[in-house]
């Protein structure tokens, strides 16, 4: 039995419809329709772009509740903090000419 993805359907409405969502994601309109109807599962890697496109009105957690987004969000936060720290450290060493 196919399960309609109501959250993705709502996301499409927020951005102006299925065709608009297809353009935003760089996919075909039939793909968007299949993801809504549950013919094919919405790929998890599309969820962050959808969340951004809806300006947070539809969250990744709503689009794919089977994925532990809180873990991924924490990991991404830690990675960004590490990158900023590495950047700061490299900047300090490039200016430290004593």
UniProtKB/Swiss-Prot annotation:
Explain what the UniProt record notes about the effect of disrupting the gene for this protein.
The toxic effects of racR silencing can be observed in the ydaS deletion mutant (where YdaT levels are elevated), but the ydaS-ydaT double deletion mutant shows complete attenuation of the toxic effects of racR silencing.
Record carries keyword Transcription regulation: yes
MF terms in GO: DNA binding
Q: Taxonomically, which superkingdom?
A: Bacteria
Annotated coiled-coil positions are none
Upregulating conditions? Not expressed under normal physiological conditions. Expression is repressed by the transcriptional repressor RacR.
- InterPro entries per record: Cro/C1-type_HTH, Lambda_DNA-bd_dom_sf, YdaS_toxin-like
UniProt KW keywords: Transcription, Transcription regulation
**Biological role stated in the UniProt entry:** When overexpressed, it induces Rac prophage excision, possibly to counteract the lethal toxicity of YdaT. Overexpression of ydaS or ydaST reduces growth and leads to loss of cell viability. May contribute to toxicity and morphological defects.
UniProt miscellaneous comment: Encoded in the Rac prophage region. The ydaST locus was predicted to encode a toxin/antitoxin (TA) pair in a genome-wide prediction of TA pairs, however it was shown in subsequent studies that it does not form a toxin/antitoxin pair. Whether or not the YdaST-RacR module forms a toxin-repressor combination or an atypical toxin-antitoxin system, or whether they are actually essential regulatory components of the prophage genome, has been debated.
The name on file for this protein is: Putative transcriptional regulator YdaS
- Organism of origin is Escherichia coli (strain K12)
Q: What is the lineage of its organism?
A: Bacteria, Pseudomonadati, Pseudomonadota, Gammaproteobacteria, Enterobacterales
What gene is this protein a product of?
A: ydaS
